[in-house]
Regions:
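Glycine-biased, low-complexity coil/linker segments
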Residues: 258-261, 542
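Catalytic alpha/beta core of large soluble enzyme barrels
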Residues: 80, 233-239, 243-245, 264-360, ...
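Conserved active-site neighborhood of enzyme catalytic/cofactor-binding cores
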Residues: 51-85, 96, 100-104, 182-187, ...
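N-terminal, positively charged nucleic-acid-binding surface of large information/translation enzymes
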Residues: 1-249, 337-350, 354-369, 394-434, ...
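Active-site cores of enzymes that catalyze phosphoryl transfer or operate on phosphate-rich substrates
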Residues: 295-301, 305, 409-413, 540, ...
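Phosphate/diphosphate-binding loops
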Residues: 380-402
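A glycine-biased structural micro-motif
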Residues: 297-298, 371-382
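Extended, non-catalytic structural segments that build the interaction scaffolds
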Residues: 6-7, 117-125, 322-342, 437-453, ...
Length: 635
């Protein structure tokens, strides 16, 4: 292939443009693959799928540069290097964009508009900037097959994802549970642990020391919380059975000025851990007695917000023992609101505390919580809750507490921890296998695998994969209304063979069409009908299936897939350690008991002028076209 010469002075832009034109005319990319077929020496690459409902940024150029360099190098060594493009087309990023366009800012508004119409808009939205991606890809000289991409919204891709979930179901790795999950009221959906890991922010907000008045004593137990909005849902206090506690009496006002609201009367008695007296108390105190936490267990106290929770026929407002109580901070006493924390929920189920919500799915206090709180967004009520506690003499003191708190990775709103039903992949059951598989991957830099991914996997949690949304791969699980039998469908053929006679054949594998399909119960002794669980999959599960779903495996291309799995090389930014890198590894471990990729290159982030990561959601992305024809972007 003759290389064109630049006339006169070197013009890099003209040279690049002429080379691209020549590659297109001679179909050089295709020939680089076909001319090496007979050598039967493949080098396999998996493209991380971007979403085409947003313009490409400079960070996409950088990642594609590293992908292209390695693939060209392997081509020059004589390998067959096929590069299939991919599109990630489901999930919240798409829904949120369409909601903004249509001014549908709640689930109720979406359902009033119509799920079918909304999902059609989502389907159209994902291709908004496809041409911009094509032009950027061609202009930078990135070789990838964009004419035959894998697309996560295609029925073939969805069917392969269904098949993988059925493998997990049959192995006992897919289960329905009621757990406390990070939840975003603005998007109306829960999140998995690896999604939450991408959205922590440092915040400064009020924390409070609260007085819980014992029923059999004049003393009050002090507890500390950084989430005042959970206090109306309090139903229990947890102490460490072997921790030493003190009962103290207030003898004088504080010697230093008092910061914030709260206080205590002279002669008032308080109970807290001995080791934390100096950290918590501001008044002068006299220690009346010391005793182990076990002496507090079983004692009852008065509710903070009478009537907010129905405590009849339960063990509500009781002190219990718990092994997670420490004296590292707080008062050595943990306030327990069953529905709003993982430890709280587990303890509540064990001790028989009432499991009742004081907060709705919209993030607002439900009617009957308190007249000054009902119907209001919880994070806006902290100050009013503190006022109410001070008015009733239940506030010892408040202070500002700075800590990292999870925020929605798409809306940037703070998440709430909320007890809810969800479908989980039991990653804890394959913990040792996924750690082993991670050690088999060649990571660059090495610490990405040994530290960042390794430490993450050492604390792996069950993966909450169901989302209470509309646009996504439907969870293929049906449950019998009559006997409760559960069935996971693994193919379109299986669904059609089991559907009731009056159920329609869905025109595509999306909501609301699959919602209309009812199945005959798989229990031979039951004549009931099975209804699909109204969830879609975590879109990270979608992309985690890319290694096999791109080939519609196992329904087609079995030999093709088996010849390229696991892939030789993937490359994305380092934040994908707990995103795509993890989901690929999690799915391949649970389905194939194997790695999904042999080598992984993780790249650092491109930062803006303020040192923050560039992202579409922040609006700080640099447009590649502002630089392509001005300078050598590769430099």
């Amino acid at each position: 292939m003759p290389v064109p010469k630049a006339a006169g002075n070197l013009d890099p832009v003209a040279l690049e443009t002429s080379l691209i034109e020549l590659w297109n005319e001679e179909n050089t990319f295709l020939h680089s693959i076909e001319n090496r077929r007979e050598r039967d020496s493949p080098f396999t690459f998996l493209e991380g799928p971007p979403t085409a409902n947003g313009k490409p940024g400079i960070h996409h150029v950088i990642s594609r540069l590293y992908k292209d360099m390695v693939c060209r190098w392997k081509t020059m060594e004589g390998h067959v290097v096929e590069r299939k493009a991919g599109w990630d087309t489901h999930g919240l990023p798409v829904e949120i964009e369409v909601q903004k366009q249509l001014d549908l800012m709640s689930n109720e508004a979406i359902e009033a508009f119509g799920m079918e119409a909304f999902n059609q808009k989502c389907k159209e939205s994902v291709w908004t900037y496809e041409q911009a991606w094509r032009e950027m890809t061609e202009r930078m000289g990135f070789w990838v097959d964009m004419d035959d991409p894998y697309v996560t919204l295609h029925d073939n891709y969805i069917e392969s994802a269904w098949w993988s979930l059925k493998q997990m179901f049959d192995k006992g790795l897919l289960f329905r549970g009621h757990k406390v999950l990070p939840y975003c009221p603005q998007t109306g959906t829960s999140y998995s642990s690896h999604e939450v890991a991408q959205g922590y922010k440092e915040v400064s907000e009020p924390a409070v020391f609260i007085k819980f008045k014992l029923k059999d004593s004049i003393a009050s137990i002090l507890a500390w919380t950084t989430t005042p909005w959970t206090l109306p849902g309090n139903v229990g206090l947890a102490v460490g059975p072997e921790v030493t506690y003190c009962r103290v009496k207030v003898t004088a006002e504080p010697s230093s000025s008092w910061e914030g609201r709260g206080g205590a009367e002279i002669g008032e008695e308080l109970i807290l851990a001995k080791d934390l007296l100096g950290n918590v108390l501001r008044h002068k105190m006299e220690v009346l007695e010391e005793f182990p936490g076990s002496d507090l267990i079983g004692r009852n106290y008065e509710p903070l917000f009478p009537g907010a929770v129905d405590g009849s026929n339960s063990n509500a407002w009781t002190v219990v023992g718990a092994d997670f109580v420490t004296t590292s901070d707080g008062t050595g006493v943990v306030h327990t609101a069953v529905m709003y924390g993982e430890d709280d929920y587990n303890l509540g189920m064990k001790e028989g505390f009432p499991a009742q919500h004081t907060v709705g799915m919209d993030g607002k206090f439900i009617e009957g919580t308190h007249e000054k709180l009902d119907g209001r967004y919880v994070k806006e009520c902290d100050s009013d809750i503190i006022d109410l506690l001070e008015t009733t003499g239940k506030l010892y003191r408040e202070h500002i507490y700075t800590h990292d708190y999870p925020h929605c990775w798409r809306t940037d709103h703070p998440l709430l921890y909320y007890a809810m039903d969800s479908w989980f992949v039991k990653m804890t059951a394959v913990k040792e296998r996924i750690i082993q598989h991670n050690s088999e991957v060649e990571w660059a830099p090495e610490w990405t695998g040994t530290k960042r991914m390794g430490e993450w996997l050492s604390n792996v949690k069950d993966w909450a994969i169901s989302r209470e949304r509309y646009w996504g791969t439907p969870i293929p699980v049906w449950i019998c209304e009559k006997c409760g039998s559960e069935h996971c469908v693994g193919s379109v053929e299986e669904m059609i063979s089991m559907k009731t006679d009056d159920s329609p054949t869905p025109p595509e594998l999306h909501r609301p069409y699959v919602d209309d399909v009812k199945l005959n119960c798989n229990n031979d002794n039951c004549s009931g009908e099975m209804i699909r669980e109204p969830y879609v999959m975590d879109c990270w599960f979608d992309s985690g299936c890319a290694s096999f779903a791109q080939w519609h495996y196992p329904f087609e291309n079995k030999e093709k897939f088996e010849g390229v799995f696991p892939v030789d090389y993937i490359c994305e930014a380092v934040d994908q350690t707990r995103g795509w890198f993890y989901s690929l590894l999690a799915v391949s471990t649970t389905v194939f008991d194997n790695v999904a990729y042999k080598r992984c290159l993780s790249l650092g982030h491109i930062l803006d002028k303020d040192g923050k990561k560039m992202s579409k959601s922040r609006g700080n992305v640099v447009n590649p076209w502002d630089h392509f024809n001005l300078s050598l972007i590769h430099i």
